């Protein structure tokens, strides 16, 4: 939403709209920064694979939000070239994150499916009262040898998320 509002902020920065755009930009940047840190800390303590990915996504979207706030602040303070670079970096991160995280979510679905399959073959057929959670990462050791394609997809998605191809 903030990215779609950039043309509006461009108009307001030229005196045709709301005063105090710099304050709005700072609020956007700080909101994003605080949210990014909080969501990352929440993701860090999760055991459910999908919750880790979801909170990580929240953290990264907040990081992108911070970049957009900084871009608006730079634009408002007549650093137009730096503002364009910050905006472009935010949009690049958004696209890269969407593609890589989509791959990670699909691979996690494959892992969860395999965990259900493996558990049902090991457990007794009539034992439906156990507390097995196929999404709990504490139960997922040694899956790379059983799911080499999924492990490769996870490795590629993880490398893309951290920017490894660009380093």
Task: Show the residue positions of the predicted features.
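Hydrophobic transmembrane alpha-helices and their helix-loop junctions in integral membrane proteins
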Residues: 1-167
């Amino acid at each position: 939403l903030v990215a779609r509002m950039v043309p509006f902020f461009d108009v307001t920065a030229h005196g045709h709209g709301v005063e105090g755009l710099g304050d709005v930009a700072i609020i956007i940047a700080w909101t994003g920064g605080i949210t990014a840190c909080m969501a990352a800390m929440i993701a860090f303590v999760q055991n459910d694979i999908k919750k880790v990915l979801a909170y990580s996504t929240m953290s990264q979207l907040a990081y992108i939000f911070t970049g957009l706030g900084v871009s608006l602040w730079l634009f408002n303070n007549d650093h137009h070239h730096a503002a364009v670079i910050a905006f472009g970096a935010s949009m690049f991160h958004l696209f890269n994150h969407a593609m890589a995280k989509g791959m990670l979510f699909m691979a996690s679905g494959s892992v969860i499916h395999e965990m259900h399959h493996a558990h049902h073959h090991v457990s007794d057929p009539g034992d439906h009262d156990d507390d097995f959670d196929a999404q709990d990462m504490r139960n997922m050791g040694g899956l790379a040898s059983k799911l080499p394609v999924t492990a490769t997809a996870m490795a590629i998605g993880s490398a893309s998320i951290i920017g490894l191809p660009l380093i």
